[in-house]
Swiss-Prot record:
Catalysed reactions listed for this entry: (E)-4-coumaroyl-CoA + 3 malonyl-CoA + 3 H(+) = 2',4,4',6'-tetrahydroxychalcone + 3 CO2 + 4 CoA
GO biological process: flavonoid biosynthetic process; polyketide biosynthetic process
Protein family membership: Belongs to the thiolase-like superfamily. Chalcone/stilbene synthases family.
Pathway assignment: Secondary metabolite biosynthesis; flavonoid biosynthesis
Protein name, UniProt field: Chalcone synthase
Function summary: The primary product of this enzyme is 4,2',4',6'-tetrahydroxychalcone (also termed naringenin-chalcone or chalcone) which can under specific conditions spontaneously isomerize into naringenin.
Top EC class for this record: transferase
Domain of life: Eukaryota
EC number: 2.3.1.74
Catalytic residue list: 164
Matching Gene3D superfamilies: 3.40.47.10
Gene Ontology molecular function, alphabetical: naringenin-chalcone synthase activity
Keywords attached to this entry: Acyltransferase, Flavonoid biosynthesis, Transferase
Length: 391
């Protein structure tokens, strides 16, 4: 009879969790940032607030965003005017949208990841579904499983209402699942729809308007597993370590509350300062065992909460301008998609590395870091190792 130690050893994978495929998706409705202030104040019937509109225009100009994608169209907003009020009773309307749209958009990204992976979907053993856009039972994980036609016995995990750091959370969870379940293939999906938080402007809550200037819709998907079969699977990144921490003296810096008026966000002005002040500690904890202390020797995948966060992190660490290029490109092309952002940046990183003729998926470097920042203030840190590119 086998001992419990032998059973546990047999259940564990030999190698590290590895990202094997990436897929992304957005709604078809593109919003161009240069036009957005006029559009936003028109659809919310707020054009009489001329001074506030100019403040919002400056927010959009400083956002470093060129384009975002949104499920909400002008037609949908005309049919649901309660979404356009600042604090209109609207949760039922919002929930009816996101309960169906979150898994639908997630499916689009997942189908692309599964196609790139190239294996039958019956080989998926676990599903991690993540969204900050609404809640429901059975959850978006169940709906995604049904939409994709996955096995009824697939093991599901649902993460609701975690916020912008959750792209790191799902990687940390996927790492543990892949490394502790031999042969596991984990489908990870982050899907976000801003219908849960869209609202009209008010002078009384400029932090709410910052969110209106930044947030966009998108879904990202990964296939994660250990010990890849190199005859049929193509590794992209390995995960060496993952951790989470609460930053000191940061309570209330980022809050989100799901209420009858939808999801409201509240931000303190010093969020970039709090993050930049503490980021060195997070890096040292993650990389001192590896022997890396020059942060320019890493490839970078950082959640783009906004340009001020990126600017202060860059300055604090003395990063070269190109270090955050992939992050800034995603912010520019898609806006802040909450949990899905870092999955888009992973996709941008491997594609850019291939386009540029780099020797690895991490811009020619071996080691990289993925950061998620969000409510708490919570920081997720994932240590990544690139794989060689046959250019």
């Amino acid at each position: 009879m086998a001992s419990i130690e032998e059973i546990r050893q047999a259940q564990r994978a030999d190698g590290p969790a590895t990202i094997l495929a990436i897929g992304t998706a957005t709604p078809p409705n593109a919003i161009y940032q240069a036009d957005y202030p006029d559009y936003y104040f028109r659809v919310t019937k707020s054009e009489h607030m001329t001074e506030l509109k100019e403040k919002f225009r400056r927010m959009c100009d400083k956002s470093m965003i060129k384009k975002r994608y949104m499920y909400l169209t002008e037609e949908i907003l005309k049919e649901n005017p309660n979404l356009c009020e600042y604090m209109g009773s609207s949760l039922d309307t919002r929930q009816d949208m996101v309960v169906s749209e979150v898994p639908r958009l997630g499916k689009e990204a997942a189908v692309k990841a599964i196609k790139e992976w190239g294996q039958p979907k019956s080989k998926i053993t676990h599903v991690i579904m993540c969204t900050t856009s609404g809640v429901d039972m059975p959850g978006a994980d169940y709906q995604l499983t049904k939409l994709l036609g996955l096995r009824p016995s697939v093991r599901r995990f649902m993460l609701y209402q975690q916020g912008c750091f959750a792209g790191g959370t799902v990687l940390r969870l996927a790492k543990d699942l892949a490394e502790n379940n031999k042969g596991a293939r984990v489908l990870v999906v982050c899907s976000e729809i801003t219908a849960i938080c869209f609202r009209g402007p008010t002078e009384a809550a400029l932090d709410s308007m910052v969110g209106q200037a930044l947030f966009g819709d998108g879904a990202g998907a990964l296939i994660v597993g250990s010990d890849p079969d190199l005859s049929i699977e193509r590794p992209l990144f390995q995960m060496a370590w993952a951790g989470q921490t609460l930053l000191p003296d940061s309570e209330g810096a980022i809050d989100g509350h799901l209420r009858e008026v939808g999801l409201t966000f509240h931000l303190l002005k010093d969020v970039p300062g709090i993050i930049s002040k503490n980021i060195t500690n997070a890096l040292e904890e993650a990389f001192s065992p590896i022997g890396v202390s020059d942060w320019n020797n890493l490839f970078w995948i950082a959640h783009p909460g906004g340009p001020a966060i990126l600017d202060q992190v860059e300055a604090k660490l003395g990063l070269k301008e190109e270090k955050l290029a992939a992050t800034r490109n995603v912010l520019s092309d898609f806006g802040n998609m909450s949990s899905a952002c870092v999955l888009f940046i992973l996709d941008e990183m491997r594609k850019k590395s291939l386009r540029d003729g780099a020797t690895t998926t991490g811009e020619g470097l071996d080691w990289g870091v993925l950061f998620g920042f969000g409510p708490g203030l919570t920081v997720e840190t994932v240590v990544l190792h690139s794989v060689p590119l046959n250019c």
